[in-house]
């Protein structure tokens, strides 16, 4: 099979600028907020939070120009990353490649961050585990155990950029499986086999508001935080130390909390609880 998803993708700016993306973003609506300029002579690793059910805020902001990414961050080319398994589906993979998506594998990340300045890879850090915690009014993040994206950033001297989407968890209702043995067992088994899980969720229908797979209309506001420089490896050092990883993670979490606390009373007035890092 063609390995474009591992080698930088096959993006089409024409496809990314189709009018349909504006209709998609305006449905919720989705908007993008910038905390700081990004230097196009550098590379970046965006951490996207929370995962939500299917990360539709990330789709609207980073695979199209519907929210004006290139106007806010001139000279920066974003690549939203996803699992390799998504590129095994004929035709669907071609759409993913056309909108600038690529694999989240180590090989793909290395290739993208080595391709030249102005590259930003976007990683939905919490992954499948976090999707099971996506409930309206909450923001339970799986982050403390996630050090791989920080290690990758240090290897390539790419600044880390915390990104938080208010409303991502509010566009679907999810049946809580934490106390339902059979559902939870099936979900964890599926995750082990295929690398992702299947939350039991529902939205609205096309002709009704009660149940269906269409997401509920709820504003999604994605705030892109300030870039965090990463430590340099010493001559002869091939891997960052645990201290370097944890100290960088602490700075990352601090900036993530800063943008959450700055905007939570504006964009999350109906929240049930504040952001929590649960794992």
List each language-model region with its residue ranges.
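C-terminal helix/juxtamembrane-tail motif
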Residues: 265-279
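Charged, glycine-interspersed solvent-exposed loop segments at helix/strand-loop junctions
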Residues: 230, 240-243, 270-272
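Hydrophobic alpha-helical segments
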Residues: 231, 255, 259-266
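Hydrophobic alpha-helical membrane-embedded segments
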Residues: 1-8
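Generic macromolecular interface patches on structured domains
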Residues: 56, 163, 262, 266-269
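Structured cytosolic regulatory/catalytic domains appended to multi-pass membrane proteins
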Residues: 119-120, 127-130, 249, 253, ...
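Pol beta-like nucleotidyltransferase catalytic core
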Residues: 220-223, 243-260
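Soluble catalytic domains of membrane acyltransferases
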Residues: 9-12, 16-228, 235-238
